[in-house]
């Protein structure tokens, strides 16, 4: 499935940090298309995986939005800068079951399962100078919001959080009225743009994955989290799905990775980065 004009989907040139070990693209022992908001886990995760499976040396992986990775799989490749990446992944992960269902219908995956969960948090500057205490506070006229764009996978969970906290009125206030007023500013890559805006004083708050607050703090950024509360943070809705592609070029190594991702060691690595493990 190429894009509507028949071309391969294009990976924005600015996403170079999400293409890892491209030199192994055609000779990899394992190819992973990981939902992008796991980017902060991958070094620790793959370091431990390689210790357990030292024969899996060359790992090419992407940490792009899973919707873009899905288009890449269905189109048979994607264009990145001056290269065509047409490698079939061994493993694909997504935060929506719809993506897995589409791949299943088209015969690209046979089985998939949930392996992880996440939750939402409100990222604010250290000390919470605007005294933001709840999701409803984002409707205040004086609060500047760094809001993930609708094409980002986190966006519909955030909208659900707003609706749960304040109904359609709060959704309209934040996404329409405050956008028109200039106090809701949308992002393209929220996990980079939101921490930058907050630390530079360009935004007061940004709804993000809780894991992204943990990562920003590990990077030394002076931010903290305001917890929406379990009733609102979507933890029961945010599921991460994983599957081996039916035509995986390295099926044996793909199975090793699937076994590893369920292991207590892998789940603990995710927990340390703020995720909610599925296999307790």
Model-inferred region functions:
Residues 113:
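Conserved, well-structured beta-alpha core segment at the onset of a catalytic domain
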């Amino acid at each position: 499935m190429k894009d509507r004009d028949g071309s391969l989907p294009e990976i924005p040139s600015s996403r170079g940090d999400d293409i890892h070990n491209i030199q192994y693209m055609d000779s990899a022992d394992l190819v992973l298309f990981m939902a992008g908001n796991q980017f902060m886990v991958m070094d620790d995760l793959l370091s431990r995986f390689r210790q357990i499976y030292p024969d899996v040396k060359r790992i090419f992986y992407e940490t792009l939005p899973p919707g873009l990775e899905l288009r890449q799989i269905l189109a048979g490749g994607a264009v990145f800068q001056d290269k065509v990446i047409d490698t079939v992944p061994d493993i694909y992960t997504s935060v929506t079951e719809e993506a897995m269902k589409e791949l299943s219908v088209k015969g690209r995956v046979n089985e998939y399962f949930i392996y992880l969960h996440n939750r939402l948090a409100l990222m604010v500057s250290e000390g919470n100078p605007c005294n933001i205490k709840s999701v409803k506070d984002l409707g205040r006229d004086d609060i500047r919001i760094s809001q993930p764009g609708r094409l980002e996978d986190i966006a519909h969970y955030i909208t659900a959080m707003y609706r749960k906290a304040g109904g359609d009125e709060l959704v309209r206030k934040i996404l329409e009225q405050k956008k028109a007023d200039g106090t809701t500013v949308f992002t393209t890559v929220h996990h980079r743009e939101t921490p930058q805006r907050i630390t530079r004083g360009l935004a007061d708050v940004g709804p993000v994955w809780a894991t992204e607050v943990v990562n920003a703090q590990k990077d030394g950024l002076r931010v903290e989290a305001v917890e929406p509360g379990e009733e609102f943070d979507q933890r029961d809705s945010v599921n991460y799905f994983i599957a081996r592609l039916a035509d995986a070029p390295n099926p044996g190594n793909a199975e090793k990775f699937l076994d590893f991702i369920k292991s207590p060691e892998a789940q603990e690595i995710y927990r340390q980065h703020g995720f909610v493990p599925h296999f307790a």
